[in-house]
Design a protein with these regions (language model features):
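Glycine-centered short loops/turns at secondary-structure junctions
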Residues: 121-122, 199
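N-terminal helical cap/lid subdomain that shapes the substrate entry/recognition surface
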Residues: 2-13, 17-108
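Asp-based, Mg2+/Mn2+-dependent phosphohydrolase catalytic module
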Residues: 1-9, 22, 88, 112, ...
Length: 229
């Protein structure tokens, strides 16, 4: 259980509130049509979804740049699909993906309802490893930006979750003591272990079906937050 009183809630964005997989798939579907690329979307996603997580982990750990992340994840997928796509096309596609991703606004089930519920009793914030220009548009376009008092992203912080410095920046921006806040996110490593390391409480939204870990309470649906807050 969580220790009360809690005054502030810190949310991750992608895979926690904003339906990344669905919005990403819709973006690629649109771009393959626009670029006249004959790519089977389902086959593409079978490769892309797990590879994207691998490349994001490398980016989070500082082993690759965001430019390399954006390019290499597509290049690797097309190579595995044995599709001949030029470097120029990959670069165009990569840039167009970033530009168009935030135009899709699907949220995860019960997201809006739980934000409205929590907004009545808590101050809410975002801590995200996503790119600043994209994450800002996601929040605005999906109609949830007004719920959050502060937004801290890795571009502005100069470090990525689970680095303690990004959490300290968020805690300072919120003006609270760590034990008064709870982090809710999908990544056990980046969100949960990172938050716990600086004294924040945590709720793990286990959308990736990680094994039982005992680090903190686990929820499988955003609606279950009501059991704790």
């Amino acid at each position: 259980m969580l220790k009360k009183p809690i005054t502030d809630i810190f949310f991750d964005l992608d895979h926690t509130l904003w339906d990344f997989e669905r919005n990403s798939a819709l973006t690629y579907q649109q771009l393959f049509q626009d670029f006249d690329l004959e790519v089977d979307l389902d086959h593409f996603l079978e490769h892309y979804v797990p590879l994207n997580l691998i490349f994001w982990k490398a980016f989070r750990e500082g082993r690759i740049s965001k430019e390399k992340l954006r390019y290499e994840r597509l290049k690797t997928v097309f190579e595995r699909m044995e599709l001949r796509v030029s470097d120029r096309q990959i670069n165009y596609l990569s840039e167009a993906y970033i530009e168009n991703l935030s135009s899709h606004t699907h949220l995860l089930p019960n997201c809006m309802e739980i934000l409205e519920y929590l907004h009545k009793g808590y101050k809410m914030h975002i801590i995200t490893n996503g790119f600043e220009e994209v994450q800002t548009r996601k929040l605005l376009n999906s109609g949830i930006a007004h719920f959050f008092r502060t937004v801290v992203n890795s571009d502005r912080a100069g470090v990525k979750k689970p680095d303690p410095r990004i959490f300290h920046m968020a805690i300072e921006a919120a003006g609270i003591q760590p034990q008064s806040g709870v982090m809710i996110g999908d990544s056990l490593e980046a969100d949960i272990q990172g938050a716990r390391a600086v004294g924040l409480q945590a709720l793990h939204f286990n959308v990736h079906k990680d094994p039982d870990h005992g680090v903190c309470p686990v929820i499988l649906d955003l609606e279950q937050i009501k059991q704790y807050l």
